A protein has these predicted regions:
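Conserved SGNH/GDSL esterase-like catalytic core that processes O-acyl groups on lipids
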Residues: 2-107, 111-202
Length: 202
């Protein structure tokens, strides 16, 4: 409703809920050929892996990981994007574009954490798209050297999708069973600030 009145700046935050074996909104899909994930949730007393902005994190020991983002053709209408920011753990394998239009994507891989333990990689696409295919790389940045898989701790948190237009960018975060107290952790609040919210609605 707000985006209809004030403009639509993009889908905003999306997280791999389905890969973490919980409910996912019906306007996007995040899929992977990797089947086994360890999942951390903000509601866990002893978290199985670190959690990110969306209150979850997914972790895999696979030496090769892909993440495919797709906006749902009906429920996601109007949420095409030309920029995606991937939030990952500091020791996670970086991702590079894959698929038919990978050459039209400008990739900026972070070298310095945006906040403690979190890297934010930016993918700028030359035209609006409804899909983004990413595949991990073990190549050391700026070299041809392949690093051993044991060097990495592959934790991924989610994406922020934008379209470059002015308007409302609405981020919805939440985990089944979560309460206010689950979102007051100091580390979580620092991560939430990465989205630069102008208004928080609890």
């Amino acid at each position: 409703l707000l985006q209809a009145q004030f403009g639509n700046a993009g889908r905003g935050w999306i997280a791999p809920f389905k890969l973490s074996k919980t409910n996912e909104p019906d306007d996007y899909f995040i899929s992977s050929s990797v089947r086994e994930w360890v999942t951390g949730r903000c509601i866990q007393a002893n978290k199985k892996c670190p959690v990110g902005i969306g209150g979850i994190g997914i972790q895999s020991v696979s030496p090769s990981i892909n993440l495919d983002v797709r906006i749902a053709p009906n429920n996601g209408a109007g949420y095409s994007f030309n920029q995606a920011i991937l939030y990952r753990g500091e020791k996670a394998m970086p991702m590079l574009p894959a698929g038919s239009f990978k050459d039209s994507i400008q990739t900026s891989l972070a070298t310095v954490p945006a906040v403690a333990g979190v890297l934010a990689d930016t993918f700028r696409i030359s035209h609006p798209v409804d899909t983004l295919q990413l595949h991990s790389t073990r190549r050391k940045q700026g070299t041809d050297k392949l690093l051993p898989a044991s060097n990495f701790k592959n934790v991924y948190y989610g994406f922020s999708l934008t379209n470059g237009y002015p308007g409302v960018l609405y981020h919805s975060v939440g985990v089944n069973g979560a309460m206010y107290v689950n979102y007051t952790d100091e580390a979580y609040v620092r991560q939430l600030a990465l989205l630069k919210p102008s208004l928080l609605i609890i």
